[in-house]
Amino acid sequence: MNIIDLGLIRYAEADALQRARLEEVAAGAEETLYLLEHHPVITLGRNGGGENLHVGREWLATQGIDLVQSSRGGNITCHFPGQLVAYPVFRVAKRPGGLRQMFHDLEEVVITTLAHFGLSAARWEGRPGVWIENRKICSIGMAVRRWTSYHGFALNVGRDLSLFEMITLCGLPDAQATSLYRELGGDAPTMQEVKDVCARQFRAIFADSTVAAGQAAL
């Protein structure tokens, strides 16, 4: 498994990278995990979500915020600097339990990463993602093509969650967004510290990892 840190990248560019790598992985290349942050973007999933957007596309454009229809599962969500995004391009068919188990394992990566920093997080039956009580700290939405996964999870790390004010989070009116900073304040880890722990948890839960030559990697 290659683990590649893409840094700060636009959504469309990361989507194109995933799709290209998916074709290679489906043909037998090594599985790849991309870790990154996105420039501000609001995405709509396969379940829709346009009705949960509180502002217009034109206004978003004036603020430099993209609005994108995504191929991932789920409803509306947003991405921004200060949020750790993980995109595993993995072969689903070879994994016991298939996509359902993979989804569970992604949640486990997040739960164990948060536990490392002293936060008790959990699954919520019927509500995908990872929660701290009624506060959502991580959204998960995946897609599968040629029995290979892409898209993944978005874990809120930093202070600024203002983009969530523009949407009804995942179409759930009672859902609140939180982050490691919101929960831990001055004791919150840096983005790099969260990336490092997240990478270790992926290795522990999914597989041993190797580093792609010539790429920034963890």
Swiss-Prot record:
The record's EC number reads 2.3.1.181
The BPL/LPL catalytic domain extends over: 27-210
Active site, UniProt feature: 170 (acyl-thioester intermediate)
Kindly list the positions annotated as binding substrate: 72-79, 139-141, 152-154
Please name the Pfam families in this protein's record: LplA-B_cat (PF21948)
Where does it localize?
Answer: Cytoplasm
**This protein's superkingdom?**
Bacteria
Sites marked Lowers pKa of active site Cys:
136
The family line of this record is:
Belongs to the LipB family.
Q: Which HAMAP family match?
A: LipB
Q: What is this protein called?
A: Octanoyltransferase
Q: Which organism is it from?
A: Nitratidesulfovibrio vulgaris (strain DSM 19637 / Miyazaki F) (Desulfovibrio vulgaris)
